């Protein structure tokens, strides 16, 4: 039980990667807060985790709203007494050429990824500093390292998370707080499934070509990364015992990006 007696907050945890991370953490002994904009889905995910016994709560949270984040994190502390792990995972994707990208959509995407990461980090650090320890994990992407067409704000935001993690690693060290970034390749989640027809239409190619020739072309084996792959990396980072591993980004992508 790598996370026995630990408390984790996972944003965007009602579905996809976040939900799998929450399940993996709970199975490893943690108490988990399912934080999500979709309150009904968050409660449903928490109910699933609670079927073996109470180990999860749902927290309705718009990560771009300061009041939502601060009250949500306070609710976690009220329920479980502490916060040991934050996984900043909430995010969206909008696909369009840069010269056609609406400014409002640019701001919305960056707010969810970067403002959300900042607000949840700040709230978590205030509790972690009191406890003299904790770990923060940001959900980056191979797009934290590479660029792709049609994804200007997403690439910008994911690069920004690496910078934030490095600052948190430096500022948090004397308080026993670590920060790292997971950089998955393409994972077959609803977020990616939505992109496939969108890119096919904008690029004038088939959906099969989007998958084979764009998404998986640079992998070593033509395979998608899985939510289980990402969750296991999150568990490794969450349960690491010292500050030896901090300020780093871990790419899990079937070799798409090698560093």
Question: Which residues make up each language-model segment?
Answer:
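Short, small/polar-rich loop/turn modules that mediate ligand/substrate recognition or access, typified
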Residues: 87, 173, 178, 245-247
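Active-site helix of classical SDR
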Residues: 121, 157, 165
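Residue(s) in the substrate-gating loop at a strand-loop-helix junction
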Residues: 141
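Alpha-helical segment proximal to the catalytic Tyr-Lys
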Residues: 126, 170-171, 243
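Substrate-binding pocket helix/loop in short-chain dehydrogenase/reductase
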Residues: 97-98, 102-110, 215
């Amino acid at each position: 039980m790598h996370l026995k007696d630990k408390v984790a907050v996972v944003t965007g945890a009602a579905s996809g990667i976040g939900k799998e991370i929450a399940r993996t953490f709970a199975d490893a002994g943690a108490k988990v807060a399912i934080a999500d904009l979709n309150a009904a889905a968050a409660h449903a995910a928490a109910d699933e985790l609670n079927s073996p016994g109470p180990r999860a709560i749902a927290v309705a949270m718009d990560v771009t709203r300061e009041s939502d984040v601060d009250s949500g994190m306070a609710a976690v502390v009220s329920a479980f007494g502490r916060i040991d792990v934050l996984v900043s995972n909430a995010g969206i994707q909008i696909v369009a050429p840069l010269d056609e990208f609406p400014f409002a959509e640019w701001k919305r995407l960056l707010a969810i990824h970067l403002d959300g990461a900042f607000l949840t980090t700040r709230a978590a650090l205030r509790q972690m500093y009191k406890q003299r320890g904790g770990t923060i994990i940001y959900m980056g992407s191979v797009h934290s390292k590479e660029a792709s067409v049609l994804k200007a704000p997403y690439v910008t935001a994911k690069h920004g998370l690496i910078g934030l993690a490095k600052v948190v690693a430096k500022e948090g060290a004397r308080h026993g707080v670590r920060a790292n970034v997971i950089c998955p390749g393409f994972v077959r989640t609803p977020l990616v499934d939505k992109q496939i027809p969108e890119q096919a239409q904008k690029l004038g190619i088939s959906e099969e070509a989007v998958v084979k020739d764009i998404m998986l072309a640079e992998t070593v084996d033509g395979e998608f990364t899985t939510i289980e792959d990402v969750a296991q990396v999150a568990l490794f980072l969450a349960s690491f015992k010292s500050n030896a591993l901090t300020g780093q980004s871990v790419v899990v992508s079937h070799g798409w990006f090698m560093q």
